[in-house]
Amino acid sequence: MSEVTRVVVDAMGGDYAPEWIIRGAVEAINEGAKAQVILTGKEDVIKKELAKYTYDQSKIEVVNATEEITCHEAPVQAVRSKKDSSLVVGLNMVKNGEADAIISAGSSGAILAGGQLVVGRSKGVKRSPLAPLPVSYTHLTLPTNSLV
């Protein structure tokens, strides 16, 4: 793994995408995150949103993906049929060593299915982990359900 963590961020995944996803990526970079952010999604839409911010442009890369997976789609079918979705493009980057991690606020089912179908599980992991971040205005809870 490189010194700087290369993190794919699915810019099109989530209820408030891409605006809030991109804002979060820019804020992370501006606050000193030691990461190279790779935003996947519709390049023209992402670049238009990025133009609203001031940030170190060498730390954010945009990779075009023409399709999106929504929460209303069957996860496995969506991952298999939408090869140029922002999620699947990002997962392939992780699989091919072009990125170290992926973050998505999109369909949980598609994220789990894609992780297993595209990237695969790490040795010793029996069941795919899910780490949602439930938040309130007063605290953050970090549950996990991985089985190693």
Model-inferred region functions:
Residues 18, 129-132, 143:
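Proline-rich intrinsically disordered, low-complexity coils
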Residues 138-144:
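Conserved small/polar residues in nucleotide/adenosyl-binding loops
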Residues 1-105, 110-116:
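Contiguous, glycine/small-aliphatic-enriched amphipathic segments in soluble metabolic enzymes
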Residues 27-28, 110, 114-134:
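A glycine- and small-aliphatic-rich helix-loop capping segment at beta-alpha/alpha-beta transitions
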